[in-house]
């Protein structure tokens, strides 16, 4: 038992007691107990700070049947157990004499007392445990991009971007530097280590990079990042969206995800004797992701809109290949200054994904490659966007699913990724995504009206 988990006389772990002390010290009057549903939507219940000790010792009960994809009404009682390591003051709720804070929770099944199999955070924990059983610790660093849009006089989002800036632009083209600065202040106050921020390629598109962490903390950070960005953008009368492709014919928003494995404190992905500084373990992990990419796409690119981003010409990957330099490939090996920084970058996830499920799917896919000792194809250094079908066949390069329906088909054919998610999550996720795609197929878009209404 670690020092943090040693129980105090009051039945609290030392870590939980430290949170109670901080609540009193910082005049926290309300706590948000947060978790995510299967689709990645953040849910929360607010409790008075006076109930914090009870939350740690007994948990907080809620109706799981009211959460999409959780349980049926006849088995609805669920329990939230807060993770004390996730305690953070909400910067946009801090006042002179009071504050609100957040704790991320694990979800438990009250009938069995076991972790709920439909809890996305639990799904990722199982992936991490599998890696640990193989002797690996996982580090990850995502890069979620987002757009800022103007709000109308009623506070509703418009499709007017906040500026006309481009990649790395400065003011006056970049009108969001103050917004990004305030977002960074908020993130840093919640424990983020920020590396850089900048305007992205498209008008109104932005990126704020934070440092890598262990896989669970990284997924927690993505969920937190999205909440902070939206809340602080709203203070500037702007609407922040992580929709992958809100504007046609410009770059969409991705969430490039850097991953590395460590073993006995050393980077298991590094081999200085290799041409690409990649170990055999790294290549096998890469091969696993490439093999399972069609199924992983359903989880990492989970919306109809995701596939409007995954098209040639806008710096988003379409073809299943890897490269040591080429950004048109699905997976890239970024340059690393030190052996500890050796990693791979999965370029296909987007920020609409559930970060817990997406990371779990990537991890299981990669570990499957290691367990089966898969051979990794040679890297492709040419621009794959310029390949014709014959040349892609020559290189053995397959294409990602063209839409959400095809991605879900791939998921239903891939037992490794189904096992990664677990039976409950797979069933509920597929059901939700089939319904979403069906709704999309019968919807009549503005494009169709413009194209056909006066033509026929």
Curated annotation (Swiss-Prot):
Catalytic activity: L-glutamate + NH4(+) + ATP = L-glutamine + ADP + phosphate + H(+)
Cofactor, free-text remark: Binds 2 Mg(2+) ions per subunit.
Cysteines engaged in disulfide bonds, as pairs: none
Positions of L-glutamate binding: 251-252, 309, 315, 327, 347
SMART domains according to UniProt: Gln-synt_C (SM01230)
Requisite cofactors: Mg(2+)
Gene Ontology MF, one: metal ion binding
Binding site for Mg(2+) 2: 145, 200, 207
An annotated GO cellular component: membrane
Regulation of its function: 12-fold increase in the presence of 2-oxoglutarate. Up to 18-fold increase in the presence of 2-oxoglutarate and GlnK1 or GlnK2. Inhibited by AMP and glutamine.
GS catalytic domain: residues covered: 120-456
Keywords noted in UniProt: ATP-binding, Cytoplasm, Ligase, Magnesium, Metal-binding, Nucleotide-binding
One GO process term, biological-process aspect: glutamine biosynthetic process
Chain residues that bind ATP: 195, 260, 327, 332
Role description: Probably involved in nitrogen metabolism via ammonium assimilation. Catalyzes the ATP-dependent biosynthesis of glutamine from glutamate and ammonia.
Family, similarity comment: Belongs to the glutamine synthetase family.
Name of the protein in its database record: Glutamine synthetase 3
Source taxonomy: Archaea, Methanobacteriati, Methanobacteriota, Stenosarchaea group, Halobacteria
């Amino acid at each position: 038992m670690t020092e943090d988990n040693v129980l105090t006389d009051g039945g609290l772990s030392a870590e939980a007691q430290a949170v109670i002390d901080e609540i009193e010290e910082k005049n926290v009057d309300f706590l948000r107990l947060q978790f995510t549903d299967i689709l990645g939507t953040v849910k929360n219940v607010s409790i008075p700070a006076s109930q914090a000790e009870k939350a740690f010792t007994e948990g907080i009960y809620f109706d799981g049947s009211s959460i999409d994809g959780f349980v049926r009404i006849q088995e609805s009682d669920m329990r939230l157990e807060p993770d004390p390591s996730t305690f953070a003051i909400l910067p946009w709720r801090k006042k002179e004499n009071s504050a609100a804070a957040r704790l991320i929770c694990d979800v438990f099944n009250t009938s069995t007392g076991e972790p709920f199999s439909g809890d996305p955070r639990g799904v990722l924990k199982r992936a991490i445990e599998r890696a640990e059983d193989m002797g690996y610790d996982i580090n990850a660093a995502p890069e979620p991009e987002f757009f800022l849009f103007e709000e109308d006089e009623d506070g509703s989002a418009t499709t007017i971007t906040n500026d006309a800036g481009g990649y790395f632009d400065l003011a006056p083209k970049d009108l969001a530097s103050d917004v990004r600065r305030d977002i960074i202040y908020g993130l840093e106050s919640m424990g983020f280590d920020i590396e850089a921020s900048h305007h992205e390629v498209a008008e109104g598109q932005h990126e704020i990079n934070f440092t890598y962490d262990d896989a669970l903390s990284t997924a927690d950070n993505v969920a937190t990042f999205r909440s902070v960005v939206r809340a602080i953008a709203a203070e500037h009368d702007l609407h922040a969206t992580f929709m992958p492709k809100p504007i046609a014919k410009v770059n969409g928003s991705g969430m490039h995800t850097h991953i590395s494995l460590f073993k006995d404190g050393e980077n298991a992905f590094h081999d200085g004797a290799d041409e690409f500084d990649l170990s055999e373990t790294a290549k096998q992990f890469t091969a696993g992701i490439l093999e399972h990419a069609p199924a992983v796409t359903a989880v990492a690119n989970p919306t109809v809109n995701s596939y409007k981003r995954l098209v040639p010409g806008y710096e988003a990957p379409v073809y299943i290949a890897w490269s040591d330099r080429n950004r048109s490939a699905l997976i890239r090996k970024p340059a690393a200054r030190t052996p500890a920084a050796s990693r791979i970058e999965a370029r296909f996830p987007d920020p609409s994904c559930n970060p817990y499920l997406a990371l779990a799917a990537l991890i299981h896919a990669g570990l499957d490659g290691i367990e089966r000792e898969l051979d990794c194809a040679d890297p492709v250094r040419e621009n794959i966007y310029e390949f014709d079908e014959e040349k892609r066949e020559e290189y053995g390069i397959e294409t990602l699913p063209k839409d959400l329906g095809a991605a879900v088909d791939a998921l239903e054919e891939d037992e490794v990724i189904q096992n990664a998610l677990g039976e409950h999550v797979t069933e509920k996720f597929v059901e939700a995504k089939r319904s979403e795609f069906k709704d999309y197929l019968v919807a009549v878009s503005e494009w169709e009206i413009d194209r056909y209404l006066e033509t026929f």
